[in-house]
Amino acid sequence: VVYQIYPRSFADSNHDGIGDLGGVRDRLGHLTWLGVDAIWLSPFYRSPMADFGYDVADYCDVDPLFGALDDIDGLIADAHALGIRLVLDWVPNHTSEQHPWFVELRRGTADPKREWYVWRDPSPSGGPPNNWRAAFAPVPAWTLDPTTSQYYLHCFLPQQPDLD
C-alpha cells in the first residue's frame, strides 16, 4: 500500500499552522496500523512556494516551512525501522526561477550550461517563439527574459522554467 502525503497539510508538529516533516514522523505509527508499505512524499525542498513546493530552488535542502535536513533524515530512519519505504517526489521537469542554475544563466547567453533550460529567440514579430500555452495558467508557455532578450519555456508557471 502506497500512501501519498502532502506534508504541508498532513500534520503540524510545531503548531505553526503548516504541516511539516515532524508531523509526518509523528504519524508513522498510524500509517503502520493502516498497513502502509510506502509513503510517496510530496516536495519538501527549499522553494519560494509559487506552486506549493513544486518550484524547487534547492534540491539539496529542506524548506524551513517543513523542517531541516535532520528532520528528513529522522523520518527516513524511523520509517525504515517500521518497514515503510519513502518515495520522494522529485521534480525533474523544471526548477524555480530562483534556483542558482537559472539565476546564473539569466546573466548572459555565452554559458555552455545555458542548454540546461529551454531558451529561444523571439519570433520574427518579436513575440514568443510559438503559440504554446502553459498547462495551469491561461498564459503563453514562454516568458521573455529582459536581460538576455530570449524567451524561456515554462509548461507550468512562469516561475518554473523548464529544464531541457
Where are these predicted regions, by residue range?
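Acidic/aromatic-lined carbohydrate-recognition and catalytic surfaces
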Residues: 1-164
